[in-house]
């Protein structure tokens, strides 16, 4: 059993927040197959800030999905706080998760969100501290190994998040520049796990049950 803040995770089977896939129906299917903690697909802090109906509809969740985490992406501290508070007050997820790993150009380059935050640990600390202060539920963070092969900083980023009050770290062991190509470097996950005192969830290249058991 692992504790993420006050949330007990009894199995080491966690559903990732896959954009366009991890909706309520899919999450319930995964729950029936043995997933314990499930993550809802990411939503934009700005879209919630401006009350975008399509985004608000994406927040739908049911009690049978618990424990459940709702992931948010963005780059503005105030928008993150507004979105996190709205989600907690309306949907009551067990966990709020902050996306610092999405590599797609629309998010990382245009919006300077997702994995773009890896380049700015000071801003990471500011965002996480503000969200932790704004909500009552645990706050977790999803990161990558780094922006590119010349800036592998997962350990620094993980420590920064822990210092800011994050209750757990998920790391996709690829860089932003890799996207979903190449292979995940599980040694990076090991380094992060050894560097922090909060739970670390490994992510990347889990295609089969055998992969998960590794």
Label for each model-derived stretch:
Residues 1-214:
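Flavin-dependent oxidoreductase catalytic cores
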């Amino acid at each position: 059993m692992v504790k993420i803040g006050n949330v007990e995770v009894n199995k080491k089977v966690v559903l990732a927040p896959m954009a366009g896939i991890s909706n309520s129906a899919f999450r319930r299917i995964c729950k029936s197959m043995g997933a314990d903690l499930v993550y809802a697909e990411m939503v934009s802090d700005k879209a919630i800030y401006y009350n975008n109906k399509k985004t608000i509809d994406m927040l739908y969740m049911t009690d049978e999905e618990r424990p459940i985490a709702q992931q948010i992406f963005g780059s503005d501290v105030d928008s993150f706080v507004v979105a996190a508070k709205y989600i907690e007050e309306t949907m009551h997820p067990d966990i709020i998760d902050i996306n610092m790993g999405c590599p797609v150009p629309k998010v990382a380059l245009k919006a300077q969100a997702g994995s773009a935050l890896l380049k700015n640990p000071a801003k990471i600390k500011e965002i996480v501290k503000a969200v932790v202060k704004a909500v009552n539920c645990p706050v977790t963070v999803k990161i990558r190994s780094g922006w590119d092969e010349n800036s592998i900083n997962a350990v620094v980023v993980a420590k920064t998040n822990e210092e800011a009050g994050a209750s757990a770290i998920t790391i996709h062991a690829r860089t932003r520049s890799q996207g979903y190509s190449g292979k995940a470097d599980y040694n990076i996950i090991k380094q992060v796990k050894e560097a922090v005192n909060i739970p670390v969830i490994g992510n990347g290249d889990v295609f089969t049950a055998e992969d998960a058991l590794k």
